[in-house]
Structures are given as structure tokens and as C-alpha cells.
A protein has these predicted regions:
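ABC-family P-loop ATPase nucleotide-binding domain
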Residues: 1-27, 329-334
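Short amphipathic beta-strand starts and helix->beta connectors
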Residues: 237-242, 270-274
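Short low-complexity, flexible loop/linker segments enriched in glycine and/or proline
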Residues: 230, 325-328
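Short, charged/small-residue-rich alpha-helical element at the C-terminal edge
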Residues: 252-326, 334
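ABC transporter nucleotide-binding domains
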Residues: 18-23, 28-214, 219-233, 239
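Non-catalytic surface loops within mature trypsin-like serine protease
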Residues: 45, 122, 151, 260, ...
Length: 334
């Protein structure tokens, strides 16, 4: 089969798949410990997917298997629609990744670092995909512009802020055309300004059609930018779906401000809109987990029941609240 035929076949596979990453029963044992156990990921194309889990949950090993750095003991990996090893290698040439801390030369400029990186990486890129060409200086400058570093292209790497260094690493991962970007802790160690810079960059890249897979422990950032999440615990995938669905799965609270919360409770129980143990009353506020999504019916029943309503609100748990409820771990995910 010629390289053009291989490219055509993997393109057809990609078009048939709604997922940029799909695994089935992915399993890996290190020593006597099963660190990844029957993990089946589905990362929607064009999504920003947050991959979360406590320390030792198997995230890093999973990422290494996705990128072909570690061989699984069992299971299947499909990247950009290609599952067979030969085709997957070709598709991996369309995947950019920043898994370890970026290794750049401190006294070289951002431009010269990317130029050097492109020279070193080109043979492997060309071997995986014969259609890939060497990059010109203008193309390297274009990548720097893409990550907002064009004005700093001649500044030495050692003079870059942490946020700038991370953006340069992302530029290196995007030197050639990519359909998928895999990032391990992209905002780790950054100050608030650096976090905002990287967040804005990832949002912009995603809007251009790039699928982004992020492993992160900063849950507040994941909640802001990720459309989908996967939650790992003890090597198993405990949840996978939209960020909104994950939060909602742990209950959405219905809040009523009223002068008579006792009457409001009676009405909710009368119509079966809430279970008794889900209702809490504090001063003039009633909070309940409803058994229905039809808020209009609930409000109408309260009004018809004589409840004087001052305010009504709905509140979903934060991503961190839901994460703690699922994993039993407080603080940062790892």
C-alpha cells in the first residue's frame, strides 16, 4: 500500500469516527499493581476534554499508552479514527503533545528554540507521515504568532515568564498540522496571569477546530474551559461525559426565598417534588433536591399553595464538589 493510499484510508477512518480518542478495555499492570483497569475513553472530536483523578489513579500511564509511549497489556486504542498500529502511527503524526516539562535552550531565543526543535523532530515526523515538509522561518514565526509570542520571538527563553514558556511548548507541539493536542498539567506552577494566558490560548485553538485533551489538577480551570471530563480512580474510569452532566449527576439544588419555608416544604412534599430528607430550611430560605426538572410546575404549585415567593434559584454543585463526592478526595485532583 502506498503512503497516499494509507493516508486516504486513515482519513476515511477518521471521518467515520465521532471521537478523536477512543479506547476499549485499556489495561496496564506495573509489577503487581493494575494501574489502568478496563478504561474505555470517548473523547469527542473538537472538544476540550479534562482528564482528572487523584494521585496514582492511572492518568499518566493512560496518556502514555494513548501516545504510544507505553504498550498496553490489553485493550484497543483508536486515535483520530485509526486503530491498526500502522495507521495509528500515521495519525499520531497529527497529534501534538506536551507531557513532560518542555526542554528548551535557555540562552536561545524563542524563535531559535522552535527552529532547533523543528530540525530535530523532522526526521521522525517525516517517517510517520511522508507528506510532512520542513518548516520555513515564516512558518515558525506563524506558530509563534498563533500562541501570542511573535513580539517576543527574539527574546531569550530564560527571560520568558512561566506562562510564555508554556505557550512556547504548545507552539512546539503545533509546529506541524495537528488535529489533537494532548497536554499534561498545562497550567501547573503558573501564576494567575499565566493561567489566564494559557486558558485563552487553548480556548482559541479549540475554536479553530482542534481537539484538546488535558490532564489537570486545577479543577476551577477545568470547569471553565472543558466541555467534557473523564474521572479516574484506582485505575478505573468512574465517570465520562459532559462537564455539565457530571455536576448535575450529583444533584441540582432548588432554592426558595420565602417568609414561610415550612409551608413551602409542605407543598413540595404534597406534590412529590422532593423527598423529605432532601429539604433543608435556614431562616427564610428553603433548599431542596427536586425529583423533576419542570421548575415552572414547582413554582406554580408553590404559588397556588399560598407560598409568598421572594426569589427562586437553581444551583448545581461545582466541579470540585462533584469530584470530591465521586472520589472521596478533597483539595486538588492529581
Amino acid at each position: 500500500m502506498t503512503s497516499e493510499q494509507e493516508t486516504s484510508q486513515t482519513n476515511r477512518l477518521e471521518q467515520a469516527s465521532p471521537c478523536a480518542i477512543a479506547t476499549k478495555g485499556l489495561t496496564k499492570t506495573l509489577g503487581s499493581t493494575k494501574v489502568v483497569d478496563q478504561v474505555s475513553l470517548e473523547v469527542p472530536t473538537s472538544s476540550i476534554y479534562g482528564f482528572l483523578g487523584p494521585n496514582g489513579s492511572g492518568k499518566t500511564t493512560t496518556i502514555r499508552m494513548l501516545l504510544g509511549l507505553v504498550a498496553p497489556d490489553a485493550g484497543e486504542v483508536e486515535i483520530l479514527g485509526a486503530s491498526e498500529p500502522k495507521h495509528r502511527q500515521l495519525r499520531l503524526s497529527r497529534v501534538g503533545a506536551v507531557v513532560e516539562g518542555p526542554g528548551f535552550y535557555p540562552y536561545l531565543s524563542g524563535f531559535d528554540n522552535l527552529k532547533r526543535f523543528a530540525q530535530i523532530a523532522f526526521p521522525a515526523q517525516r517517517k510517520a507521515n511522508p507528506t510532512i515538509m520542513k518548516l520555513s522561518g515564516a512558518e515558525i514565526s506563524s506558530r509563534l504568532e498563533q500562541v501570542g509570542l511573535l513580539d517576543a520571538k527574539n527574546k531569550a527563553y530564560r527571560a520568558y515568564s512561566l506562562g510564555m514558556k508554556q505557550r512556547l511548548a504548545i507552539a512546539a507541539a503545533l509546529l506541524w498540522q495537528r488535529d489533537l493536542l494532548v497536554l499534561d498539567e498545562p497550567t501547573n506552577g503558573l501564576d494567575p496571569q499565566g493561567i489566564v494566558e494559557v486558558r485563552d490560548l487553548l480556548t482559541s485553538l479549540n475554536q479553530s477546530g482542534l481537539t484538546i485533551f488535558i490532564s489537570s489538577h486545577i479543577l476551577s480551570e477545568v470547569e471553565i474551559i472543558c466541555s467534557d471530563v473523564g474521572i479516574m480512580r484506582d485505575g478505573r474510569l468512574m465517570f465520562q461525559g459532559s462537564t455539565k452532566a457530571f455536576r448535575s449527576s450529583f444533584g441540582e439544588e432548588f432554592i426558595v426565598e420565602t417568609a414561610d419555608p415550612g409551608l413551602a416544604k409542605s407543598v413540595l412534599l404534597q406534590f412529590g417534588f422532593a423527598e423529605p430528607d432532601s429539604i433543608q430550611i435556614q431562616a427564610k430560605r428553603l433548599t431542596a433536591t427536586l425529583t423533576t426538572d419542570e421548575i415552572e410546575r414547582v413554582v406554580a404549585a408553590l404559588v397556588n399553595g399560598g407560598v409568598g415567593i421572594r426569589a427562586v434559584a437553581r444551583s448545581s454543585p461545582s466541579l470540585e464538589d462533584a469530584f470530591v463526592a465521586l472520589t472521596g478526595r478533597s483539595g486538588h485532583a492529581r
